[in-house]
Amino acid sequence: MFAFLRGELVTVSREEAVVEVSGIGYLLHISSGTSRRLPPEGSQVRLFTHHYVREDAQQLFGFLDEEELQLFRLLLTIGGVGPKLAMAVLSGLSVGEIQEAIVANRPETLYGITGVGKKTASRIILELRDKILKIQPAASGKTAGAPQALQLNEDALAALMTLGFPKPAAQKAISGILETSPGLSVEEVVRAALIAIHNNF
């Protein structure tokens, strides 16, 4: 719904920020890392956003850079990981530290984070390691194509879920397609995923 918000930073705390845009104050949930990096209240700021919608609530999550936003969205693809836990992960470690722990298969680094147990840490590594390696072979956090690859995965996943397919089946199909054919567009990935899902039924 919103790609980003640009406006005056009205208030900021460890977990929330209010940004005023054209007279409207938007409440955004943020990581502690983003909170530390924000400019003083009253400054102009731009935050990338993720609009989370469920039956009983709507929430906006804010990020200073696209890399943190895309990792947040990747975490949401894991069963049992909601936005609150994803934010806890991003608050516990930097994006680079999380990626390094995933690539190096170090679950103990992740289960030191509040709310992340051994099973959840292992699941994060199991489900995200190949994705991180694919978009970031050196695990340096500086691969130019990383945000685009993560966005493609997110867009294809959203399209399939809109069509009524469950997230686990959709993500499995997308991951398999991106592994064998990394240069496809979103539309091509969705078409190939539809074929793969139907063939598995």
Curated annotation (Swiss-Prot):
It comes from the Bacteria. GO terms for biological process: DNA recombination; DNA repair. It is found in: Cytoplasm. GO terms for cellular component: cytoplasm; Holliday junction helicase complex; Holliday junction resolvase complex. Residues 144-154 are annotated as: Flexible linker. Keywords: Cytoplasm, DNA damage, DNA recombination, DNA repair, DNA-binding. Residues 1-64 are annotated as: Domain I. Residues 154-201 are annotated as: Domain III. GO terms for molecular function: ATP binding; four-way junction DNA binding; four-way junction helicase activity. CDD domains: UBA_RuvA_C (cd14332). SUPFAM superfamilies: DNA helicase RuvA subunit, C-terminal domain (SSF46929), Nucleic acid-binding proteins (SSF50249), RuvA domain 2-like (SSF47781). It holds the Pfam family RuvA_N. SMART domains: HhH1 (SM00278). InterPro entries: DNA_helicase_Holl-junc_RuvA_I, Hlx-hairpin-Hlx_DNA-bd_motif, NA-bd_OB-fold, RuvA, RuvA_2-like, RuvA_C, RuvA_C_sf. Residues 65-143 are annotated as: Domain II. Belongs to the RuvA family. Homotetramer. Forms an RuvA(8)-RuvB(12)-Holliday junction (HJ) complex. HJ DNA is sandwiched between 2 RuvA tetramers; dsDNA enters through RuvA and exits via RuvB. An RuvB hexamer assembles on each DNA strand where it exits the tetramer. Each RuvB hexamer is contacted by two RuvA subunits (via domain III) on 2 adjacent RuvB subunits; this complex drives branch migration. In the full resolvosome a probable DNA-RuvA(4)-RuvB(12)-RuvC(2) complex forms which resolves the HJ. The RuvA-RuvB-RuvC complex processes Holliday junction (HJ) DNA during genetic recombination and DNA repair, while the RuvA-RuvB complex plays an important role in the rescue of blocked DNA replication forks via replication fork reversal (RFR). RuvA specifically binds to HJ cruciform DNA, conferring on it an open structure. The RuvB hexamer acts as an ATP-dependent pump, pulling dsDNA into and through the RuvAB complex. HJ branch migration allows RuvC to scan DNA until it finds its consensus sequence, where it cleaves and resolves the cruciform DNA. Has three domains with a flexible linker between the domains II and III and assumes an 'L' shape. Domain III is highly mobile and contacts RuvB. This is Holliday junction branch migration complex subunit RuvA. The gene is ruvA.
